[in-house]
Design a protein with these regions (language model features):
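Soluble catalytic regions of membrane-associated enzymes that act on cell-envelope
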Residues: 47-213, 236-247
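Alpha-helical linker/edge segments of TPR/alpha-solenoid repeat scaffolds
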Residues: 99-121, 176-187, 195-224, 251, ...
Length: 341
């Protein structure tokens, strides 16, 4: 009997250990982005669960989006984001991916837009470490290295592990783009390897501002204008500026920022017609300046007629115009956490 027990107990223990190992392996295979993000931010599985909770379907998708953006895989970002989800972080990454692929303006009204919060993540004393860690991505891609470095430093400081390859690698990249070889070597020594200097990093170098200026952290418009002045070919920064104006419903600022030779987009045509209608002029020169087509003008007249006939009731039959800037301009409101508009 004792001999049998000596055989059964080790066998049962081995079986239990095997089942446990298979459970954890299965979880890692089921949630690969969760565990990859843990490694990228210097967290073991226990710390990851403590600070970010257990892995689940929604967090796996969001972490996958963050990792794809960090690697510059914009097709994957667009594949993983969905217009059916009202999530500010998803909108932030979706907009950035569209800007990197040159289609921000054309896609803006087809996705959930929480006003300017879908373009930039503001950081204050209430911001979570996770959001802080993502806040610098847009500035890095647009070429605002001072803001990108500040965000990376904050992310490192507020990270639960106070380290992480993701943040150190980004700081190395920023200093490589800025041409600070001494700082690059410092981060390479900490990382223990040399980051890959890909062509996209050389392209970002052409976007960086040649002069710096004092500005408030939330003064996005001034910083975008500085980037555009430094490099007028920075199309992503220009689209971000124009889309910022439009999401804030600042039509006058949009017209001023658009200039005499702004880019062509159906979104910009729609916004221009609101301005032209409000100013009481639709001269052919102005229509040409904003690249307004006959179809856009015809649909604007139809939208205005339906809207005025219903005296502003949002239940009016305007479904076919739901993805236009006119609809956003008339009906979009920002609801805060306390329910106020």
């Amino acid at each position: 009997m004792k001999a049998t027990a000596r055989v059964i107990i080790p066998t049962a223990l081995a079986l239990l250990l095997s089942v446990t190992a298979l459970f954890f392996i299965g979880r890692r295979l089921r949630y690969p982005h969760y565990y990859e993000y843990a490694g990228e931010t210097g967290l073991n599985a226990s710390l990851m669960r403590r600070h970010y909770g257990r892995p689940h379907k929604s967090s796996e998708r969001l972490l996958g989006i963050c990792l794809a953006a960090d690697h510059g895989d914009w097709d994957k970002v667009l594949e993983m984001t969905s217009p059916d989800r009202s999530n500010t972080l998803e909108t932030y990454f979706h907009n950035l991916a569209c800007a990197m692929k040159g289609c921000l303006a054309d896609s803006l009204m087809h996705y959930y837009q929480p006003f300017s919060r879908g373009l930039f993540l503001t950081v204050d004393e209430m911001t979570s470490p996770f959001v802080i860690a993502q806040s610098g991505e847009v500035w890095y891609r647009l070429g605002a290295m001072t803001m990108a470095e500040h965000s990376a430093m904050l992310a490192l400081a507020f990270s639960p592990a106070k380290t992480g390859p993701k943040f150190l690698r980004r700081l190395a990249d920023i200093n490589f783009i800025n041409g600070d070889s001494e700082a690059v070597l410092k981060y390479e020594r900490i990382l223990g390897y040399r980051p890959e200097w890909t062509p996209d990093k050389l392209q970002i170098r052409s976007f960086i501002a040649r002069t710096d200026t004092v500005h408030l952290a939330k003064d996005f418009r001034s910083l975008l204008k500085l980037l555009i002045r430094s490099n007028p070919d920075n199309a992503a920064a220009r689209d971000y500026l124009l889309c910022l104006d439009l999401l804030e419903k600042d039509i006058d600022a949009f017209v001023k920022d658009y200039g005499a030779d702004g880019p062509s987009s159906r979104l910009y045509e729609e916004a221009a017609l609101i301005y032209l209608c409000g100013s009481g002029t639709t001269s052919s020169d102005l229509l040409s300046r904003f690249h307004v087509g006959e179809e856009t003008l015809r649909e604007f007249i139809d939208f205005t007629h339906i809207f005025e006939s219903a005296e502003g009731d949002r239940r009016i039959p305007l479904e076919k115009y739901r993805h236009t800037y006119w609809y956003y301009y008339k009906f979009a409101t920002l609801v805060t956490n306390d329910g106020k508009h």
